Amino acid sequence: MGSEALAYALRLLARKGYSRAVLRAKLAARFGEAEAEAALGRLEAMGYLDDRAYARAFVETRARRYGPRKLRALLLARGVPEEVVEEVLPEARVEEALAVLRRYRHREDKARAVRFLEGRGFPLGVALEAWRLAQEEGEGYK
């Protein structure tokens, strides 16, 4: 019972991490709801499926490019429960926004740079503060 679903799930997880919701959808589409739930239960019992670990790894690999709002939206879109998202997300830090801004090629244009940071999930206040610090550093910002 469910050994095919379990084997399929293990093959998927061997390639990359999945949230419980995404893996459940993949398994349910192929094997049905009952087998999917049974396989997910076994995976959780064996320690191969953990939304907190998935969310932490997801944030670690993308935190340099995206701010907390963007990361939150991406995690929620992948079916990670909101309480897990709130637990693993870091606070928006001005230093991170400034580091992202330094890599942006249109950083001399304030409006574009602030929009760029907002698009990466940084709140407006953090984006503006990063812009102000960049001006103080005198790195060619206008």
UniProtKB/Swiss-Prot annotation:
Subcellular location as annotated: Cytoplasm
InterPro entries (UniProt xref): RecX_HTH_1st, RecX_HTH_2nd, Regulatory_RecX, WH-like_DNA-bd_sf
GO CC terms of this entry: cytoplasm
Keyword list, A-Z: Cytoplasm
Domain of life: Bacteria
Alphabetical GO biological process terms: regulation of DNA repair
A Pfam match: RecX_HTH1
Function: Modulates RecA activity.
Family membership noted in the UniProt record: Belongs to the RecX family.
HAMAP family according to UniProt: RecX
Name the record gives this protein: Regulatory protein RecX
Gene: recX
